[in-house]
Amino acid sequence: MATRVLVIDDEAPIRLLCRVNLEAEGMEVLEAADGPSGLATARAETPDVILLDVMMPGLDGWRVAEELLDDARTQGIPIVFLTARAELRDRARGIDLGGVDYVTKPFNPVELAPLVRSLLERVGAGERDDVRREKLTELRSLLERE
């Protein structure tokens, strides 16, 4: 069965870029153009991974992540924030909100499939909390240097 990735981003070109590159690697891609439809799709389809933009009109990515974590049906789905917000504090917030990785735009779309595969291998091995802890430690170290 193909890995299912839900891309929640209000920018159609970003969703298309993700779709083309992930489908080329044999993954199934679901799309949502805003927070509410992303939540509905996540709850109905239970994807393996969610790529989530932060800056969306209405319900932003931070709130979407909070709602996903509060819902028993979706709280186990790994979230990768995919956003233009590159500040270290934003990255730390994303990980604090349950994200397992944080990719800043612009990004190399060819790197998405290997990222998703690696993430699923680690999460499947029960290392989700380890992945998040590593990211938080790295980000806190960088924040202390500022």
Label each PLM-derived region with a short phrase.
Residues 16-24:
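Charged docking surfaces used in two-component/phosphorelay signaling
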Residues 26-33, 41:
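Short hydrophobic/Thr-rich beta-strand motif most characteristic of the beta2 strand and flanking loop
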Residues 45-51:
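Active-site beta3 strand of CheY-like receiver
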Residues 56:
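Receiver (REC) domain active-site loop signature in two-component systems and cognate sites
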Residues 100:
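Short, glycine/charged-rich "phosphate-handling" switch motifs in NTP-dependent
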Residues 107-116:
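C-terminal output helix
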Residues 123-146:
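CheY-like receiver
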